[in-house]
Amino acid sequence: MKVSDFDYALPEERIACYPPAKRGSTRLIVLNRATGSITHSAYASLHEELRPGDLLVLNNSRVIRARLIAHKPTGARIELMLLEKHEEAQNLALYRGRLRIGDRLLAHGVELSVEALPSDGIARLSCATGNLADLFDAHGSVPIPPYLKRDAEELDRERYQTVFAELPGSVAAPTASLNLTDELLDKINAKGVGIAHVTLHVGLGTFLPIRSERFEEHVMHREFYNIPQTAARKIGETKASGGRVVAAGTTVTRALEHAAPKLIESGFTQEVSSEADIFIYPGYEFRIIDALITNFHAPRSTVLMLTAAFAEKELLMRAYHEALDNGYRFLSYGDSMFIS
């Protein structure tokens, strides 16, 4: 199986460029791996797919102001996207435009210098007056995905954020949860479904394409995550009682599956903090999650491959084509699927 096997035609008009008028009013395709069935539902009815004793695991990372516009002395516009808000990488940014080592940029009266270009589309920057992350915090905007082909607007500050976002650190939202509302979470809880929160700060890999044709040649980015002891215990108790661990998105999936050896070794009694660099593609054996909520992903993306690993590629692509035929909206602001 090659990366090109995960290519498909995604018409531009199927990409959701804006969120729905009302949070939670999107559609939902339901996949049953055991029967191969594909049914159509609504995201607002997600609670009907869950069972008493299940555990819904959410990513409570909060999207930071990671997008900043700078200019060269010539006036040329350079778009910068802060990659990670960590000490060791806080001066790395994706950029759009032409840059060379030694270039000077100006952003809101602050001079930036291009110290290095470590890889294609990534610049290492220094800030003349202090911390680069502080500059982004003060003057940056919400980093909506580049494929939306528009600047962030006021509505994105609220809608490109989950209702339970808490800990700042992501440069992209955990989009599978964007349509979860307080009302829907109350219905899920009332049904006897547990809820646990983990943190994974979404970083670099969300925006970088796979450039190799072979899975083995692709190097995944690292993303910090934390699974609190309370969440670990809930996962262990759910597993022991026969309930399903339902991952709200690929970010939760990466955190839980990367942490699987430590969680299992500790008997689900210990907190786990690490950096996930796990690349999940068909052939991977899942150790923690039993069901997955996720969006419709871009062709040739690592998240599409993760979803195919969980759902089986043939069933997943059949669902994708059915979604396209039925007018579903794709990518971050689009519709979703529930895979059990």
Swiss-Prot record:
Keyword Flavoprotein: no
GO MF, any single term: S-adenosylmethionine:tRNA ribosyltransferase-isomerase activity
Pfam families linked: Queuosine_synth (PF02547)
EC number, UniProt record: 2.4.99.17
Example GO BP: queuosine biosynthetic process
Swiss-Prot/TrEMBL keywords: Cytoplasm, Queuosine biosynthesis, S-adenosyl-L-methionine, Transferase
Catalysed reactions, semicolon-separated: 7-aminomethyl-7-carbaguanosine(34) in tRNA + S-adenosyl-L-methionine = epoxyqueuosine(34) in tRNA + adenine + L-methionine + 2 H(+)
Compartments where found: Cytoplasm
Main location: cytoplasm
A Gene Ontology cellular-component term: cytoplasm
Subunit structure as annotated in this protein's UniProt entry: Monomer.
Protein name in UniProt: S-adenosylmethionine:tRNA ribosyltransferase-isomerase
Organism name: Chlorobaculum tepidum (strain ATCC 49652 / DSM 12025 / NBRC 103806 / TLS)
